[in-house]
């Protein structure tokens, strides 16, 4: 497990991007529970921490693919016309185990 930040660095209903061991991850605080997933959208490499956090889902700022932060699964894919134009849609994100020790957030990368 790698220390990423302090719990206080990511307030409730917020998310931030971090680079851990060369990998870009998104860390989100959903009602005091922390979730970590890949920070890059699998559709066209949008930076998910710049997107929108809605409950336990993140919406990509580029083409609005929506991912579940708990499972990493695609909840809503990009529009069909966009999938046709770009050769495919969004794929599930990798999730990472998160542990809170005192005020430290640790992620299993």
Language-model segments: residues:
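Short cysteine/histidine-rich metal-coordination sites, predominantly Zn2+-binding motifs
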Residues: 55-61, 74-83
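Short cysteine clusters
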Residues: 41, 60-63
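N-terminal pre-ligand scaffold of iron-sulfur
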Residues: 1-55, 68-69, 73, 86-109
């Amino acid at each position: 497990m790698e220390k990423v930040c302090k719990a206080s660095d990511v307030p409730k209903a917020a998310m931030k991007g971090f680079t851990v061991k060369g990998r870009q991850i998104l860390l989100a605080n959903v009602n005091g529970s922390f979730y970590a997933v890949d920070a890059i959208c699998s559709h066209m490499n949008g930076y998910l921490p710049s997107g929108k956090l809605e409950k336990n889902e993140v919406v990509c700022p580029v083409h609005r693919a929506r991912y579940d932060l708990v499972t990493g699964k695609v909840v809503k894919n990009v529009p069909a016309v966009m999938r046709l134009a770009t050769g495919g849609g969004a794929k599930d994100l990798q999730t990472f185990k998160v542990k809170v020790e005192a005020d430290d957030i640790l992620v299993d990368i």
